[in-house]
């Protein structure tokens, strides 16, 4: 999920408006008074179907709670693919899995880490994705990544890691979020904390550089030297949240500890107090397994060989449930397709609903789709991408397509003002080169647009998913769970998306490919090939 875009010129349509929320979780109220700017009966049917008979709560509960995280190559991702195909079939929508490659298969089991000396305490933490298992509980002493003066000194130190857990992350000087410090600290205290953090960041960066080993492969180097395991902490700068990513280690388990737990262990080791950890990690490597996108289609009636594509990535990191990144996007895609099947069973153009896989490893599923289907690119009217977390859609960049603003202006003028009035268009915008799946189409010259959440605490328009502190508290974290979803906003996003897809499907002509004049030194992004196996991974 990308967190920002460049703003060049913004066409403001109007400001925020809020719909009445569901009376209780899992239910929706009847459509409240709304402003339909046209007499189009399909728009009214979409509204009624999406508001009065919404299924977003049920879809979200199954995806986030029952299926859970959807790490590429995991059984969870495979279950999600199979379930969505079956659910589409229940709605009478043609759907299938389309293989685009293979990936390293891995299944997470139970993981646990305890401090057993100099005192006993269970520590908050979990194994990294694709971490090797232990053969039962493993106890070992702890050492800190050496503050070696150069790579030669680092190589001389390496034998000391044999049989030990190695701490490889910088400890935080304190585990309070910055806004908490700024709110409560005296000016002199705030200045001290900020300066300590600045110095600590610079010193640790130098320590890493002095090893002569790239940060991404450091765990593998320590593993080769006989480390019992790797301990890190990727704090997300908020209360109780860490980013949980993967590892390429093949023997030594890799654990992420909370900010507080990591700081405790680090200080004990730093002060010569000889901490000992007991680590237990269960996991199964499943070999190289096939990976799929889920593709659904509502065939067009008049121009079936032209397409409107609605997509969002289905895969997630597995530190939690992958709710806001991007379970909400997957729910919005499926619910919009359900609504469209009920309200527009015979659209003018073929509508494709795509649940992409492998986005978190480099947009691999969508890049493969673009590479595998060159025949549809010139006949695709528009691509909509849903990967914005939670909150109402309030900002849509036009991605450098000269005609896009006119199309979006026309579509938004025909949807209820409760939706249109909250949307700001960036005209003409600039093409994004990565971040989420619409970029796979942009580089090929296909008009593709990603929805964004807008206003933050002060009400300013923003291009990032900051409305609910997403970048700190849910984006790739151990707290990205079902309870973070704002369901009335997700309902409204799915309904508005269905309306935009319907209106685009009925346009007389497909959107022109004319591009804005790029600023000096800027180029239209070039397409990158997908990684079709874990061996080809570029992340």
Stretches with model-predicted labels:
Residues 34-74, 100, 110, 237-247, ...:
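N-terminal capping segment at the start of a domain
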Residues 200-212, 216-219, 223-224, 229, ...:
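Active-site-adjacent substrate-binding region
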Residues 24-77, 86, 179, 298-300, ...:
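N-terminal hydrophobic or amphipathic helices/low-complexity stretches enriched
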Residues 30-41, 61, 65-198:
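Noncatalytic luminal/extracellular "stalk/propeptide" segments of secretory-pathway proteins
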Residues 40-42, 117-118, 122-155, 239, ...:
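Soluble metallo-hydrolase cores and metallopeptidase-like ectodomains found primarily
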Residues 8-20:
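Bacterial N-terminal signal peptides
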Residues 118-122, 135-142, 149, 159, ...:
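Metal-dependent peptidase/peptidase-like ectodomains
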Residues 58, 338-364, 383, 514:
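Short helix-loop-beta-strand segments that form the rim/entrance of peptidase-like active sites
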């Amino acid at each position: 999920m990308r967190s920002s875009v460049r703003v060049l010129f913004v066409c403001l349509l109007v400001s925020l408006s809020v719909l009445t929320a569901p009376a209780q979780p899992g239910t929706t109220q009847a459509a409240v008074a709304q402003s339909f700017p046209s007499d189009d009966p399909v728009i009214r049917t979409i509204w009624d179907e999406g508001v009065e008979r919404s299924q977003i709560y049920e879809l979200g509960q199954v995806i986030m709670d029952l299926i859970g995280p959807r790490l590429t190559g995991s059984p969870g991702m495979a279950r999600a693919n199979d379930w969505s195909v079956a659910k589409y079939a229940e709605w009478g929508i043609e759907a299938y899995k389309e293989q685009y490659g293979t990936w390293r298969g891995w299944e997470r089991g139970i993981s646990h880490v305890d401090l057993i000396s100099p005192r006993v305490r269970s520590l908050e933490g979990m194994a990294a994705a694709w971490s090797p298992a232990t053969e039962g509980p493993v106890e070992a002493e702890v050492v800190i990544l050496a503050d070696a003066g150069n790579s030669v000194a680092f190589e001389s130190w390496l034998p000391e890691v044999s049989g030990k857990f190695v701490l490889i992350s910088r400890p935080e000087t304190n585990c309070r979020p910055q806004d908490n410090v700024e709110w409560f600290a005296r000016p002199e205290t705030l200045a001290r904390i900020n300066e300590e953090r600045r110095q600590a960041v610079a010193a640790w960066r130098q320590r890493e550089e002095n090893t002569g080993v790239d940060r991404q492969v450091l765990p593998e180097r320590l593993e080769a030297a006989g480390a019992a395991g790797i301990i890190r902490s990727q704090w997300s700068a908020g209360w109780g949240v860490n980013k949980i990513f993967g590892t390429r280690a093949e023997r030594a388990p890799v654990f992420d500890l909370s900010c507080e737990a990591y700081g405790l262990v680090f200080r004990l080791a730093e002060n010569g107090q000889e901490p000992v950890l007991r680590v237990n990690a269960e996991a199964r490597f499943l070999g190289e397994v096939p990976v799929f996108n889920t593709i659904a289609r509502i065939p067009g009636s008049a121009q079936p060989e032209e397409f409107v594509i609605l997509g969002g990535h289905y895969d997630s990191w597995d530190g939690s449930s992958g709710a806001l990144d991007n379970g909400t996007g997957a729910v919005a895609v499926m619910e919009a397709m359900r609504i469209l099947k009920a309200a527009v069973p015979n659209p003018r153009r073929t509508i494709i609903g795509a649940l992409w896989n492998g986005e978190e490893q480099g947009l691999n599923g969508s890049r493969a789709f673009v590479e595998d289907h060159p025949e549809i690119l010139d006949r695709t009217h528009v691509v909509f991408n849903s990967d914005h977390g939670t909150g109402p859609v309030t900002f849509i960049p036009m991605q450098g397509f000269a005609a896009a603003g006119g199309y979006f202006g026309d579509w938004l003028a025909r949807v209820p003002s409760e939706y249109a009035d909250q949307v700001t268009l960036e005209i003409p915008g600039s093409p994004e080169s990565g971040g989420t799946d619409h970029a796979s189409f942009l580089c090929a010259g296909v008009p593709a647009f990603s929805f964004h959440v807008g206003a933050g605490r002060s009400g300013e328009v923003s291009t990032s998913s900051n409305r609910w502190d997403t970048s700190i508290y849910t984006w790739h974290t151990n707290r990205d769970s079902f309870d973070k979803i704002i369901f009335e906003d997700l309902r409204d996003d799915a309904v508005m998306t269905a309306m935009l897809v319907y209106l685009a499907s009925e346009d007389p002509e497909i959107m022109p490919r004319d591009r804005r004049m790029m600023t000096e030194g800027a180029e239209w992004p070039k397409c990158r090939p997908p990684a079709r196996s874990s061996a080809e991974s570029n992340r």
